[in-house]
Design a protein with these regions (language model features):
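Helix-adjacent hinge/juxtasegments
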Residues: 48-87
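A short beta-strand-loop structural module common to alpha/beta enzyme folds
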Residues: 31-43
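Short helix-loop-beta junction
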Residues: 23-32
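C-terminal binding/interaction regions
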Residues: 9, 13-15, 91-155
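Short, conserved beta-strand edge motifs with alternating hydrophobic and charged residues
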Residues: 9, 33-36, 63-67
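Short amphipathic alpha-helical segments
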Residues: 19-22, 75-79, 119
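N-terminal beta1-alpha1 ligand-phosphate binding loop
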Residues: 5-24
Length: 155
């Protein structure tokens, strides 16, 4: 049995979900890694997104980001080549993010109810990577855009 390592990042708003997410994932045998950064009201979500994305890329694993809305974390995460982060609001989004778009990181609001957070996590982890030609073609087109214009291209 292969043990999946999940990298979890959370800012001062997401920290309220931290223990529940860790316990939930540990219950199913997943290894959860978190940054050695102390959360406070002045912390900056890009620091957590950076830590998670660097580890996801290095270890070919999955990442979960939690903040007030999930928006800032997803924007920061998508600056990394090789990261496909989706902001999700429910378990259907988590399924589509992984199965259609090949997401390796998800971001969501700390204000989502606990039961739905569990459903989101389940769908994200258990859903298979894209296999249909149309999804693979679209992911390749996204990758090509990055190569053609550069990730930080500004007009």
């Amino acid at each position: 049995m292969i043990t999946i390592k999940i990298f979890l990042g959370y800012d001062h708003q997401g920290v309220k979900c931290k223990d529940d997410i860790i316990n939930y994932l540990n219950e199913f045998g997943y290894i959860v890694k978190t940054p050695d950064i102390i959360n406070n009201d002045n912390d900056d979500y890009p620091d957590y997104a950076k830590w998670v994305c660097e580890h996801v890329l290095k270890e070919h694993s999955l990442g979960i980001l939690v903040c007030g809305s999930g928006i800032g974390m997803s924007i920061a995460a998508n600056k990394f080549k090789g990261i496909r982060c989706a902001r999700v609001v429910d378990s259907n989004d988590a399924f589509t993010a992984k199965n259609h778009n090949g997401a390796n990181v998800i971001a969501f609001s700390a204000n989502i109810p606990t039961e739905e957070i569990h459903n989101i996590i389940d769908n994200f982890i258990m859903t298979k990577e894209p296999s249909e030609e149309r999804h693979l073609r679209r992911i390749e087109k996204i990758n090509k855009i990055r190569e053609d214009i550069g990730h930080d291209h500004v007009q």
